[in-house]
Structures are given as C-alpha cells and as structure tokens.
Amino acid sequence: MAAPIILFSFLLFFSVSVSALNVGVQLIHPSISLTKECSRKCESEFCSVPPFLRYGKYCGLLYSGCPGERPCDGLDSCCMKHDACVQSKNNDYLSQECSQKFINCMNNFSQKKQPTFKGNKCDADEVIDVISIVMEAALIAGKVLKKP
C-alpha cells in the first residue's frame, strides 16, 4: 500500500514545477529554498524532510556542490556520484542505473560505519533512510515508465 502512495507522490512532485513549491516556503523559514543551488560548505539541515534535506554539499533535492567542490564525507560522495550519473543521462532523475547505484553506494557507506563530516547534526542512517524512500519511488516510477 505504501509503494503506490510514494509512487503517486513522486510522480506528482516531478510533474509540478519546483518553483511552484517555493511559494510561501521562505515565509516559514528563510533558509529553505527549492531553487537550484550549489554549495561550498558542509551542511546538515532538515535531515528527515525530503524536499528540504541538506546534507553535506551534494545531498538534497535541487542541491549540489559547486563545480570542483570535494564531498564532505562518504555519504556526500554517494550523492555527488548520483548527481554526475543523472547529469550524464540528460538529467533523467528516473534512471534505473543511477538510482540503483546510489542506493548501493549509500548501503555500502552505512554497512562500513564510515564517519560523517565534522559538525554534522544529522543521523547518517536517518538521511540514508529518507533518501532511500525517494530512490525506491524513482526505481518504481522508472520501471513503470520503462526507463533504462
């Protein structure tokens, strides 16, 4: 039952202009934005809220490190690799290959109990759980839409 709800939410989310979601968001918290940004600092905010999640420099919706920026830790490196994979697939966020590689990378990070970056306020396993839910929805949507 949860999978269809997540899939519907995922498809609905990607069918709405992201800028439309930004309406009123800054009124609630001025640091929240859904515009494409690049980061030069390691962040850890909104750890359990997928649309606003900011982890490291590369983890988060429409959020990525600036060109040439090194990832903050192993989990952030997984996000950086996912960003690069999606970009190499003409920004196809439903790419089965990119989503599966990302999930595998995060699982590997978690299993090895790698350290997180200094100053991190998020529980890495919670961040992985949140991102994994979104990626599982992307995998389902990609299968439905027959994405490679």
Curated annotation (Swiss-Prot):
Protein's recorded name: Phospholipase A2-alpha
Remarks, miscellaneous: The enzyme has a preference towards linoleoyl acyl chain over palmitoyl acyl chain. It also has a slight preference for phosphatidylethanolamine over phosphatidylcholine.
Cofactor note: Binds 1 Ca(2+) ion per subunit.
Species classification: Eukaryota, Viridiplantae, Streptophyta, Embryophyta, Tracheophyta
Keyword Cytoplasm applies: no
Induction: Induced 6 hours post pathogen infection in the area immediately neighboring the inoculated zone.
Effect of S99 to A/D: Drastically reduces the activity
Intrachain disulfide bonds: C38-C66, C42-C72, C47-C122, C59-C79, C78-C105, C85-C98
Keyword terms of this UniProt record: Calcium, Cytoplasmic vesicle, Disulfide bond, Golgi apparatus, Hydrolase, Lipid degradation, Lipid metabolism, Metal-binding, Nucleus, Secreted, Signal
InterPro entries (alphabetical): PLipase_A2, PLipase_A2_dom_sf, PLipase_A2_His_AS
PANTHER family cross-referenced by the UniProt entry: PHOSPHOLIPASE A2 FAMILY MEMBER, PHOSPHOLIPASE A2-ALPHA
Effect of H82Q: Abolishes activity
Cellular location(s): Secreted; Golgi apparatus; Cytoplasmic vesicle; Nucleus
EC annotation from Swiss-Prot or TrEMBL: 3.1.1.4
Temperature dependence: Optimum temperature is 30-40 degrees Celsius.
Keyword Secreted assigned: yes
Record-linked PROSITE patterns: PA2_HIS
UniProt catalytic activity: a 1,2-diacyl-sn-glycero-3-phosphocholine + H2O = a 1-acyl-sn-glycero-3-phosphocholine + a fatty acid + H(+)
Family of this protein: Belongs to the phospholipase A2 family.
Residues binding Ca(2+): Y58, G60, Y63, D83
Organism: Arabidopsis thaliana
A GO term from the CC aspect: Golgi apparatus
